[in-house]
Amino acid sequence: MWKNRALALTLVSILLISNVVLLTILVETDALSEGDVAIGKAAPRGAPVNLPSLKGGAILAANQWPDACSFVDQEEIKAIFPGVKNIEQESRPVSALSIKDFAVDSSWKESDRSESGQCLYSMRLPGETYSATQFWFRIEAVADPKLIVGYADRVAPGTNTNQGARGADRCVITGLNEGSWSCRKGPLLFTVGGRTTVTFKGTPAPAPFVWRDDVLPEFVQTITAKIK
């Protein structure tokens, strides 16, 4: 009799624990679904970025490059990420000096450096407790479009796909597991990338692949719309 009672109590305990575990899973799953983030659509606005007409193999010195932060503004980010908060941007310098050029002449030249050739955006998406999402845009070169075509093929090899080339002449994935694109449009060669901690609505793929394949193309379209 005591053995039967002990067995019954054990079974009841197991059932109670199972119900608690199941309830916890359901609550966490529901919380995750509520935190899923919708991806909007690119909505380019504002005036085109001023780029000079470059022909005959001309190359624009890095210190004359446009400000990278002028290609994407906060309203354009809000169009791509409805509900985004705490958007901040930071200009960062970029060096255009190759090691070959450095070997020939190691002296410092103002023309080799852009003080705002890269822009880093940080933001907080729904479900994040701090600004954990980042998007960055970096100018790689500005030159005669014919020169850019050959240069991009040489320095930015990767998986060619039209998925990211929304408005660009060409985009490549530089690595299958990397969340970045290298693109060209007219006289501009650029790279976009970033990261996030959230999951996205209606997308079964892991966040890094969704970021690369669905989010970044919207930024590419926003950027290339500024190049006339």
Q: Where are the model-predicted features located?
A:
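Hydrophobic single-pass membrane-targeting/anchoring helices
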Residues: 1-36
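A small/polar (G/S/T-enriched), proline-flanked helix-loop surface module common
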Residues: 28-228
